[in-house]
Amino acid sequence: MFTVLLNKRAQKDLLDLPKNDVRRIRTTLNELAQETEPWLLVKKLQSHEEVPLYSCQVGHYRIILTIDHGHLIIFVITIHHRHSAYRNI
């Protein structure tokens, strides 16, 4: 079982979203935390090899995250609409 941590940017992103989307995102993050191999449920981004980044789709939003396999932590970096999710990461 993994622990989900959100950085300050991701916390701020959640505050800017509609409540029903926030509920769906939280449900998805909880489901990822319950998985024994959450990296199988997300898409690995190709341009980040030194620290692998993953993308998780929830409706029109994308959750950009990293997974620390050793410490069993899912660290959420940002949550944005799909049109702007991959900028500045």
Question: Where do the language-model regions lie?
Answer:
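A generic structural signal for beta-strand entry/edge sites
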Residues: 1, 51-53, 71-73
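Conserved N-terminal entry element of GNAT/NAT acetyltransferase domains
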Residues: 1-8
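Acidic/histidine-enriched, beta-strand-rich ligand/metal-binding domains
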Residues: 3, 13, 46-47
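Enriched for short, Lys/Arg-rich terminal
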Residues: 8, 12, 16, 27, ...
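Residues in soluble alpha-helical coiled-coils and helical-bundle/repeat scaffolds
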Residues: 16-19, 37
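Hydrophobic/aromatic residues within well-ordered alpha-helical segments
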Residues: 21-24
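A short, surface-exposed loop/turn module that caps and links secondary-structure elements
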Residues: 30-56
